[in-house]
């Protein structure tokens, strides 16, 4: 019993940390990106990661249903990662289509002079008085990695909660709890970022990722302890699991 409780706690902590890392990897441009004056997707960190998390949980829950009992943790977690990656990939791709063919701009970074992946120069394509625009290659790759990290983390939390070998929560409860832990970490990461971020190449990523992961660790441990208490008592926030 103790081994099971510790395993659930560890998986929740790992899932929370991966969720926080995912938010820092996302190319988020916020309101400025809606006017093509900042690099990234024209939305906030929490909204973007919520969409990725829901997609990942949909695919993870579908794959988990293939087993009557004891779903394969790794396969379910990977399925969640793939679902989130696809969601992020399509979102960034369609966003670039609108930027390129709708607004007539070239996706480029406002934080680096040369794309670290393609080695293409960015400066001459950046519109004056903007912080870049669109989703350049390095941001696209960073977003895909963020989708993988967040989807894997969220699905990992879900599968250990729903599996009868571990927490044995109902499907609905496991989904709600996994989503709650994911969003809690996403909100804290969003406050840590404090605006827009382009991805792992952004100086803001290197400067703030350690603080973000530290805060995520604290939150994830707290959430994990609550889950362990729920497992021991058979209740969750006063309700039956």
What is each stretch, according to the model?
Residues 28-33, 121-138, 202-206:
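Cytosolic juxtamembrane amphipathic/interface segments immediately preceding
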Residues 7-28:
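N-terminal signal-anchor/start-transfer transmembrane helix
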Residues 30-47, 171-175:
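Loop-to-helix transition at the N-terminal end of transmembrane alpha-helices
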Residues 103-129, 200-203:
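Juxtamembrane inter-helical linkers in multi-pass membrane proteins
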Residues 59-92:
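Alpha-helical transmembrane-segment detector that highlights a single hydrophobic TM helix
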Residues 2, 6, 70, 74, ...:
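C-terminal transmembrane helix-loop-helix hairpin of multi-pass membrane proteins
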Residues 81-104, 187:
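Hydrophobic alpha-helical membrane-embedded segments
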Residues 39-62:
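A generic, lipid-embedded transmembrane alpha helix
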């Amino acid at each position: 019993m103790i081994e099971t409780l510790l395993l659930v706690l560890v998986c929740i902590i790992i899932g929370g940390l991966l969720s926080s890392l995912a938010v820092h990897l996302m190319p988020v441009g916020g309101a400025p990106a809606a006017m093509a004056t900042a690099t990234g997707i024209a939305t906030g960190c929490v909204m973007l990661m919520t969409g990725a998390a829901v997609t990942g949980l949909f695919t993870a829950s579908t794959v988990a249903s293939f087993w009557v009992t004891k779903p394969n943790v790794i396969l379910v977690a990977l399925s969640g990662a793939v679902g989130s990656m696809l969601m992020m990939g399509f979102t960034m791709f369609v966003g670039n289509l609108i930027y390129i063919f709708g607004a007539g701009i070239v996706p480029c970074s406002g934080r680096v002079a040369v794309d670290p992946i393609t080695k293409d120069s960015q400066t001459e394509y950046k519109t004056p008085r903007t912080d870049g625009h669109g989703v350049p290659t390095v941001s696209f790759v960073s977003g895909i990695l963020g989708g993988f990290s967040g989807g894997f983390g969220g699905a990992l939390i879900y599968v250990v909660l729903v599996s009868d070998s571990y927490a044995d929560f109902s499907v609905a409860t496991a989904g709600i709890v996994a989503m709650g832990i994911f969003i809690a970490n996403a909100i804290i990461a969003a406050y840590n970022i404090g605006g827009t971020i382009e991805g792992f190449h952004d100086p803001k990523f290197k400067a703030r990722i350690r603080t973000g992961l530290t805060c995520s660790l604290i939150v994830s441990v707290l959430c994990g302890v609550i889950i362990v208490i729920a497992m021991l008592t058979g209740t969750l926030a006063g309700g039956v699991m």
